């Protein structure tokens, strides 16, 4: 009911999508999230429901003792229509072990997304850059995504996510410069040639920097949002109160 209360204030507004992500909660299982999705679907059948990172899904399915395909099918039957790309971070194990050892590994992340694609659910792909990784790690990450896209064609977009060093265990790592950011977007546009869309996260980059990315291969900005959970601001985003509607102008 608390989660539905977040949706209710937007009744009657021209929304197109609800995006559901959260942590790995030990008391919440797959059945809970299936019920949540089905209730949102019943309340606003016009909304597209995108939800749950591969990290969350990996935990749900293991807890339920289900295969990835069985778990994904349950969520799809409940009304889930697509997935975000969170939790990818950097695929290379030597980096992943240092920054997110407890998260699902690269093979697990890719399997969950491939399974979603096989069930006709589109997903997004991300890469967290600008921390302790090097250029070879970035190329390895993008290569694995490109290979899966060649196989399934199920990715909607690729979203590079700029590392922010506020309030985390890597606060001593300097952030990438705007020049480095723009260079990465341009390379991604050329290298990820089988992805129709390259998306920039304007809350993380800031509105002005996000506008610049449109001249470096980006063709979509993520997104028209209302940051009700404070997830962007708590992560040290450039935009501390990120809210943008279709009526706003950069």
Which sequence ranges carry the predicted segments?
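Conserved Radical SAM active-site core
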Residues: 1-140, 144-148
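Auxiliary Fe-S-binding modules of radical SAM enzymes
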Residues: 5, 11, 143, 149-250
């Amino acid at each position: 009911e608390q989660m539905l209360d977040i949706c209710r204030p937007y009744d009657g507004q021209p929304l197109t999508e609800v995006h559901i992500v959260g942590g790995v909660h030990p008391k919440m299982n797959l059945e809970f999230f299936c019920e949540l999705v089905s209730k949102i679907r019943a309340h606003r059948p016009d909304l597209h429901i995108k939800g749950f990172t591969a990290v969350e899904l990996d935990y749900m399915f293991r807890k339920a003792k289900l295969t990835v395909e069985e778990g994904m099918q349950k969520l799809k039957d409940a009304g889930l229509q697509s997935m975000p790309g969170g939790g990818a971070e950097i695929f290379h194990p030597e980096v992943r072990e240092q920054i997110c050892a407890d998260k699902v590994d690269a093979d697990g992340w890719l399997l969950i997304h491939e399974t979603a694609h096989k069930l006709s659910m589109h997903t997004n792909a991300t890469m967290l850059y600008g921390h302790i990784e090097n250029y070879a790690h970035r190329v390895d990450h993008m290569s694995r995504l490109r290979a899966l896209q060649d196989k399934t064609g199920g990715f909607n977009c690729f979203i590079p996510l700029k590392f922010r060093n506020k309030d985390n265990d890597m606060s001593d790592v300097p952030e990438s410069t705007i020049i480095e950011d723009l260079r990465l977007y341009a390379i991604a546009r050329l290298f990820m040639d089988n992805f129709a869309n390259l998306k920039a996260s304007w809350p993380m980059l800031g509105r002005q920097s996000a506008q610049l990315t449109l001249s470096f291969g980006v063709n979509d900005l993520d997104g028209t949002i209302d940051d009700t959970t404070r997830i962007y601001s708590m992560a040290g985003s450039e935009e501390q109160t990120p809210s943008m509607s279709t009526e706003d102008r950069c």
